[in-house]
């Protein structure tokens, strides 16, 4: 009897977890969202309608994020995208609000790393992350001007925290932007993200 109850509770937990976390599907409309950035300004996906949009899940304390920022790889990728007219939005998902002054800290970090996001969205409570199924930092998404999700996954092909691996890696985001803008099918539209787990509480 106890085993039956335990299995029932486990099944219920899995069902609840599945309903809470929904993966955005490549080839379908990207989930709409509204949020507030680290400067306290409102941000929504709708305001960038008609443009390419990158979503990058970020955590400055994550070794995998540090790999791409300390090396300059992520800021360089951001500049490449922005120079092509792409809107780059960073997303910081957390379950514990802004009690530790995360907004101010992440603003300082963005400036120190010479990063180029149009905004860093403070996803307190994790609603945006859950809508997209964001699992790691970094976890990358590319949305085309029609609002369709065209890429979801890793920043590159080397799933490690070693900066030395960047040189020999395929930058999936650059590849996705180039191929999508050229009207080509993406070589890799979905890849496995790697990094630190996004914390939903």
Question: How would you describe each model-predicted region?
Answer:
Residues 1-8:
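Bacterial N-terminal signal peptides that target proteins for export
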Residues 12, 17-19:
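N-terminal signal peptide c-region/cleavage motif recognized by signal peptidases
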Residues 19-30:
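Cleaved targeting-peptide boundary
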Residues 33-53:
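A short beta-strand-turn-helix
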Residues 46-66, 177:
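Short active-site neighborhood of thiol/selenol oxidoreductases, capturing the structured segment around
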Residues 66-113, 124-131:
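Structural microenvironment flanking redox-active thiols in thiol-disulfide oxidoreductases
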Residues 107-150:
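Short, internal strand/loop/helix patches
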Residues 142-201:
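Thiol-/selenol-based redox modules, centered on thioredoxin-like
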């Amino acid at each position: 009897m106890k085993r039956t109850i335990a299995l029932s509770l486990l099944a219920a937990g899995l069902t609840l977890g599945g309903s809470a976390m929904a993966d955005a599907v490549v080839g379908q409309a990207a989930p709409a969202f509204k949020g507030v950035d680290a400067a306290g300004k409102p941000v929504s996906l709708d305001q960038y309608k008609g443009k390419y949009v990158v979503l990058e899940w970020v955590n400055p304390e994550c070794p995998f994020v540090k790999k791409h920022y300390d090396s300059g790889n992520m800021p360089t990728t951001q500049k490449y995208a922005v120079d092509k007219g792409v809107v780059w939005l960073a997303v910081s998902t957390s379950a514990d609000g802004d009690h530790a002054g995360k907004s101010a800290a992440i603003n300082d970090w963005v400036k120190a790393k010479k990063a180029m996001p149009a905004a860093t969205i403070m996803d307190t409570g994790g609603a945006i992350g859950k809508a997209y199924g964001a699992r790691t930092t970094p976890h990358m998404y590319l949305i085309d001007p029609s609002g369709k999700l065209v890429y979801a996954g890793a920043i590159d092909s080397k799933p490690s925290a070693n900066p030395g691996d960047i040189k020999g890696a395929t930058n999936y985001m650059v590849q996705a932007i180039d191929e999508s803008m050229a009207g080509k099918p993406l070589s890799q539209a979905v890849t496995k993200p790697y990094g630190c787990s996004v914390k939903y509480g």
